[in-house]
Amino acid sequence: MQKERIALAYSGGLDTSIMIKWLKDKYGADVVAITGNLGQQKEIEGLEEKAVSTGASSFHFVDLKKQFVEDYIWRALKAGALYEDVYPLATALGRPLLAKAMVDVALEENCTMLAHGCTGKGNDQVRFEVTFASLAPNMKVLAPLREWEFTSRESEMDYAIKHNIPVSVTKKSPYSIDENIWGISIECGVLEDPMVAPPEDAYQITTSPENAPDTPTVVEIEFVQGVPVSVDGKKMAGLDIINRLNELAAKNGVGRLDMIENRVVGIKSREIYEAPAATVLHFAHRELERLTLEKSVFQYKRHIAQDYANIIYNGTWFSPMRTALDAFVDDTQKPVTGMVRLKLYKGNVTLLGRQSPYSLYNEALATYTEADSFDHKAAEGFIQLYGLGLKTYSEVHPAK
């Protein structure tokens, strides 16, 4: 009888390294290890050798960077999706793509089960499993961290040593870190106290604003229909744009975020994020929208941005609601074409200028000089009609 096969989201860390052996023993199944590359900087060489030596029957490395930028990041940027007005959703955006890649490999490898290494109190378990349910509803999902016998990192290390599983014996960082090209999330350790300022060693890529260059960096970003297409006049692929802005913004201390956020599972958590490129691009994109979108569209889209952010954060990317919102967002982005000039300086992003062939700013209407073309006399009748409802109400209900 052929063994069942389990597709495992594999990072090469302690949890997923011992998970291969644990899953094989518990389910008598072969384990297919899958790693997705979303632009993380951590070492990915040697993962295949490590996975196979640990007991995986096969290993799949899937390069997802281009798809991540074009089909996920740009959609979120166009929508203006910032969870609770702060978080650019780097980790949350990556999870549905990783889960989809897992399902694709699982089907190719004839797997009947999907496994992940998410904890039982975090958001990622929801994101993975809701995506699995959307794309592979008949596959069984395994979450070893919710059921296995290990209660500490030390007990996991003991298991690894007992079964000759190669794991790092260097001092573990006190922080839990997740990284991709759109940003880095940092939690745990002293960061769990919301009154403790993040130690400098918690940050992975950004320069401290105090130590950033004394000379500001000026950068120009061009957009076409809401999507960045060039930096400082140089046309670039999306991946290169993000890499370039990560470099420029990080060295100027831009992109450090500290927030208390509401998790999917009902608790509040303190999160530190580094998102240099995301911070710059969201700022620039929003300013270009101010210039080009009609008032009611601009204001209504701010509500949609929160709905879109919640969809990403809550793990319902593969939903009809997200598809429907994409249609609205794409229509709003047709005039969001132009250039935004910014100054990056010691942790701050400052707007220096913006222009667009679809600008709704009319200087002749806005000016207070003799070039003013606004009909001032029209204001009197407008104000009478605009305030008529309140005037009528006040006549019936006099102010006390």
UniProtKB/Swiss-Prot annotation:
Its main location: cytoplasm. One of its GO terms (cellular component) is cytoplasm. Keywords: Amino-acid biosynthesis, Arginine biosynthesis, ATP-binding, Cytoplasm, Ligase, Nucleotide-binding. ATP binds at residues 9-17, 117. GO terms for molecular function: argininosuccinate synthase activity; ATP binding. Coiled coil: none annotated. Pathway: Amino-acid biosynthesis; L-arginine biosynthesis; L-arginine from L-ornithine and carbamoyl phosphate: step 2/3. L-citrulline binds at residues 87, 123, 127, 176, 185, 261, 273. GO terms for biological process: argininosuccinate metabolic process; L-arginine biosynthetic process; urea cycle. It catalyses: L-citrulline + L-aspartate + ATP = 2-(N(omega)-L-arginino)succinate + AMP + diphosphate + H(+). InterPro entries: Arginosuc_syn_C (IPR048268), Arginosuc_syn_N (IPR048267), Arginosuc_synth (IPR001518), Arginosuc_synth_CS (IPR018223), Arginosuc_synth_type_1_subfam (IPR023434), AS_cat/multimer_dom_body (IPR024074), Rossmann-like_a/b/a_fold (IPR014729). Pfam families: Arginosuc_syn_C, Arginosuc_synth. L-aspartate binds at residues 119, 123-124. Its EC number is 6.3.4.5. NCBIfam families: argG, PRK00509.1. Homotetramer. Belongs to the argininosuccinate synthase family. Type 1 subfamily. This is Argininosuccinate synthase. The gene is argG.
